[in-house]
């Protein structure tokens, strides 16, 4: 399982430096949606990381798909994350509440 990161060049830079290979720069809304769909189709990706503000930029239907996705598990960093907390996402993905 791999981690994929989609966002602005500044957002993905730190992930690249940390060794994440699947990083996709998306400066426009169209590129953001295109890269997210590309990651959703990639069976090797287990976690998709997005910036919280980018979640607000994508169409409602795709946002709902991401919020309900188990594989890949979608993590929005920073800002307000609509939907489930990280704890709930991990619980849904792994099947166990790791905080207990």
Swiss-Prot record:
Keyword Flavoprotein among UniProt keywords: no
One Pfam family per UniProt: ATP-synt_F
Gene3D superfamilies referenced in this protein's UniProt entry, alphabetically: ATPase, V1 complex, subunit F (3.40.50.10580)
Signal sequence segment: none
GO molecular function term, any single one: ATP binding
Coiled-coil intervals: none
One GO biological process term: proton motive force-driven plasma membrane ATP synthesis
Protein family per UniProt: Belongs to the V-ATPase F subunit family.
NCBIfam families for this protein: PRK02228.1 (NF002577)
HAMAP family xref list: ATP_synth_F_arch
Protein name: A-type ATP synthase subunit F
UniProt source species: Methanoculleus marisnigri (strain ATCC 35101 / DSM 1498 / JR1)
């Amino acid at each position: 399982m791999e981690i994929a990161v989609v966002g602005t060049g500044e957002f993905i830079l730190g992930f690249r430096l940390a060794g994440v290979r699947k990083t996709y720069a998306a400066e426009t809304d169209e590129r953001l949606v295109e890269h997210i769909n590309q990651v959703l189709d990639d069976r090797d990706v287990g976690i998709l990381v997005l910036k919280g503000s980018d979640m607000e930029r994508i169409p409602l239907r795709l946002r709902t798909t991401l919020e309900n996705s188990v594989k890949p598990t979608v993590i929005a960093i920073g800002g307000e994350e609509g939907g489930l907390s990280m704890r709930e996402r991990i619980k849904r993905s792994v099947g166990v509440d790791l905080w207990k």
